[in-house]
Amino acid sequence: MPDTDVAIVGAGPYGLAAAAHLRGAGVDVRVLGEPMSFWRTMPVGMLLRSNWTATSIADYRGPVSLDAFCAATGVQVDRPVPLARFVEYGTWVQQRIAPDVERRPVERLEAGPKGFRLMLAGGERLDARRVVVAAGIKSFPNRPAYADGLAPDLATHTGDHHDLSRFSGSRVLVVGGGQSALESAALLRESGAEAEVVVRADHLNWLHGGKYQRRLGRLSPLLYAPTDVGPMGLSRLVAVPDLFRRFPRAAADPLAYRSIRPAGAAWLGPRLQGVPITMAQSIVSATALGGGVRVTFGDGDERTADHLLLGTGYRVDIARYPFLAPSLLARLRRVNGYPVLGRGLESSVPGLYFLGAPAAFSFGPIMRFVSGGWYAGRALTRAVAGRPEPGRRDAAAPAVVTISDAS
């Protein structure tokens, strides 16, 4: 017999969502990983871009929602939700649904005689009938080739920093036009750094949150899903992953891009006053220069700075997960680094599932956000528990999550 029916690799929002739904269905589960580890490394002072409802883990209603956290703890959470509060909330969820989480990292995942074998730090071996990979995006920072030759003291990714105040008094060139780059520039300015933003596009996209939804009043739910991904109308479409995965790529790819194109929350605008933003420029080279860095743009213009901060996002490539054994990786059908997934988010290796951003190619852009865990947890549980697949269902419709020890 295996040691467990399901081993979940990762204890962030997706791993916790999977555990909540699986345990609610009576499935034997072991959760492996440091709870909310990636979120704990994000920049101090960061605010979440997602709205209140879409920030809930596992479900936007029920015993582990953000509303339930506030009611149970008496904690008042500001809007936008501060990173520190979200980590506190995620830890509360973990304590309720996975108090037995095993914090040792998984060093190797391979096929085993009873399904899969996981080697944990310290040498322990764990056999599982099924494995759910919910390991997040920490392994996938997108670092442009022009920065390859620069030392870490000259060029880093936004994901490398927990506290941007280390750049106080420095000149920092921030690359990118999305939330990560723009919020980093705001935090740098507020920390006493001299920041400039360089954007390849000729304009910035801004997300106005609930502004348009409030104007629509009762019509809002018809055009905006609680998942909070995508613009008006399209939000409802991408909130149905079972529908999205049936689209031909010629339709799916443009829909996905339109839903998650680089954009910043509108509330960042006032915080960027005084920060130069250079539009329609692409960096073609970056070289070390006298303790700093010099970048050259496509039109020949140049900038010098003390540091180059890459707000260039993440590019999924599951081959970069350090724990995946090459023999297992070779059996996985992949497209551009993404695993090709079927019903229940199952990969081409039976019994191996991928949740979160790696599922975005097959199930759409909401898999890149916390709210995607609502669908992922339910779909995974239906597959694992052997329940019949229901008809297409809105990803925002809640499922009942029964937690045995909710005290």
Regions found by a protein language model. Give the residues of each.
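Flavin (primarily FAD) cofactor-binding/catalytic cores of flavoenzymes
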Residues: 1-36, 79-179, 183-407
